Design a protein with these regions (language model features):
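Noncatalytic, solvent-exposed loop/strand surfaces
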Residues: 1-343
Length: 343
């Protein structure tokens, strides 16, 4: 079974013969689609969270589709009208009333009963954009999402953000003027990346007048004293790093309604990856965030076991894997790190 965001679902046998296909509308999304279909019994389940609205409506056309694995026929669909684009693949969990489909997206973690897809519970607190896939183990669901913009820590260090913008200080006076916001300048989201990298900062319009207006707004937002400069103290004092909070939670499935206060056993707010999914092994959770920071968390208590910096820098986009007693972590720059599992 394969899913292409630009086409839909296809099914092949092991000789590569197409058995059926199901064209689907391409979800509208800033970054494209990344959710994979998952199988449950005779069903194939796909979540298509979407920025596009239903016809003549102000609510999203996001939905969960359940298809027959045999012929691609739609068995049921459940709309998610208040959800927008998301990139997390759902997972299956065993709740107190049976199996559940667990979906992370648009600020919340939600559980749907199987096989009928009825929504049962939700847990809140995540940022708008979530990518990692939830995990299950030890009778819990573990789900994670960084702060919007990629910040991994609740109390992020503001200095890298200042270093990213002061690099555009053309006259070298230690301050930034509006006229120095040239070239690849934008407000940084991920200061560990070079300016000009697609993930470095706030996307700017291509049209000159709109681009100028956006940069004017960025400058005025930080220049609170209106002296025509950003200096280090003013920038750091006025800096807001993303929206929402970086979050890893442990949730007991099987609840009803909003379970944020009743079934979330713990939350953790440091070293949360933006793109990679965490991995659970021997009651420990391992996470790698941008900049090459490896964080290990006790899965029962939600307490940090250790936090170490790897040799790689820049972005970490690949999810870690475990082979034997070794954790394998690959950076975007091509560095592969092997770390012994355990405390």
């Amino acid at each position: 079974f394969v899913y292409f965001g630009s086409f839909g679902l296809l099914c092949y046998d092991h000789e590569g013969k197409e058995l059926w296909k199901k064209p689907l509308a391409t979800p509208r999304s800033l970054y494209g689609t990344s959710c994979s279909p998952i199988a449950y019994g005779e069903m194939l389940i796909l979540v298509t969270d979407d920025d596009a609205n239903l016809p003549d409506s102000k609510v999203s056309r996001s939905r969960i589709l359940a298809l027959s694995k045999k012929n691609g026929r739609t068995l049921w669909e459940r709309h998610r009208p208040f959800h927008r684009s998301g990139w997390s693949t759902p997972t299956l969990a065993k709740g107190s009333q049976g199996m559940e489909l667990v979906v992370l997206g648009n600020g919340s973690l939600r559980g749907y009963s199987l096989p009928d897809g009825e929504e049962k519970w939700q847990g809140d607190g995540f940022s708008r954009e979530t990518i990692a896939r939830p995990m299950t183990g030890n009778g819990k669901v573990y789900a994670s999402g960084s702060r919007l913009g990629g910040s991994a820590d609740l109390n992020a260090d503001p200095l890298p953000f200042w270093k990213a913008v002061i690099g555009f200080d053309a006259n070298g006076d230690g301050r930034l003027e509006r006229k120095e916001m040239t070239g690849h300048f934008t407000f940084p989201f991920r200061p560990q990346l070079p300016p000009g990298h697609p993930g470095f900062g706030l996307p700017l319009p291509q049209e000159a007048e709109k681009r100028k207006a956006r940069l004017d707004g960025i400058f005025l937002r930080m220049d609170k004293n209106r002296d025509g400069f950003w200096d280090k103290d003013e920038f750091i004092g006025n800096l807001t790093i993303g929206r929402g909070k970086p979050l890893l939670v442990a949730v007991r499935p099987g609840g009803l309604g909003n379970v944020t206060a009743s079934r979330v056993e713990w939350e953790f707010n440091r070293g949360i990856p933006e793109v990679p999914s965490p991995i659970l092994h021997d009651r420990l959770i391992y996470m790698v965030s941008n900049g090459g920071v490896l964080t290990c968390v006790d899965a029962d208590l939600g307490k940090m076991v250790y936090r170490r910096r790897l040799g790689g820098y820049g972005q970490y986009l690949a999810s870690p894997v475990i082979a034997g007693n070794r954790l394998l972590l690959a950076s975007e720059e091509g560095l592969l790190s092997l770390v012994r599992t355990g405390r």
